[in-house]
Amino acid sequence: MTSKNSRRNLIWGAVVLGVLLLGANFAAAQTPSPALLVLEKSDSMLAIVDPATLQIVARVPAGPDPHEIVASSDGKLAYISNYGGADSALNTIAVIDLVARKALPPINLGALRSTHGLAFAGGKLYFTAETNKVIGRYDPATQSVDWVLGTGQDRTHMVAVSESLDRIFTSNVSSGTISIIEENAVAAGSGPRKTWRVTNIAAGHGTEGFDVSPDGKEIWAASAQDATVTIIDVTSKRATQTLPISVRGTNRLKFTPDGTRVLISGLGGGAGSNLVVLEAATRKEVKKFDLGGGAAGIVMVPDGSRAYVAVSGKDKVAVVDLKSMEVSGSVSTGKQPDGLAWVQGKK
């Protein structure tokens, strides 16, 4: 009897151990929540980073020439623009399953080429197509592009969409403009057809990185060639101020979530010229950072406590503490980190 019980206990113990090990392996394979997503451009890979440890927990193929990345609202999917520029003019958007941590079949955009800027809003994916001078919208539910609108501008590069979905903003690099695209009011009895009006505002040579203030009142746009920031009043659609900044080759510009500060990265390199922080109200420089090399993508955590900045020239992502205004850590990445995204999975 004792021998049978011992055998039974040994078998049960082995089963329990197996279940525990399986659970441990399953937990280890989970994408952390929250997670930092980093595009390693030259490696054509997506790195998934655990912000708690600053370690890469997985890498997933990101398709050819990945530039920008955005996550779906539920944090389950990531979309990556495969750019190609003027030479190869690619026409795909890579899709990554962040739960399974694997690449899904890419979105084929057909004649729409050189996709770059991305925004996910209202359950749909907005994108720019530079070759065609347009913005488009992809519906994941129908797996089709359901809307396209021309900007008439050269190198329509980055895109942002208002929460109300009735206002869209783009930066147009070679035209040196910001486009404000607004939905026209539909007259009663005119049917379901919607029309849009486009206003283009001069914003400096090589306008690329831009952001809309959290209150929706201003657009701040950085000029890569002029080393300036143009401030645009959204209501009047006019540039109200141009600020000189101490960053060369400006690449990205982001407001903090509370709208009090603005971070601007630069690819120009040089000591003290990789990242600058401005006070939004006073328009004054608060701090300059020397990150060791040209800086690109910027993403901030929702509570505004820290920012992550891709230091493309040094194959790392810097962590900037926005309370102490100091660099508090870094993530070692693959070659040429660029686009960044923050994922907070819904429970």
Label the model's feature ranges.
Residues 2-15:
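Bacterial N-terminal signal peptides that target proteins for export
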Residues 20-347:
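Predominantly soluble domains enriched in secretory-pathway, periplasmic, or organellar proteins
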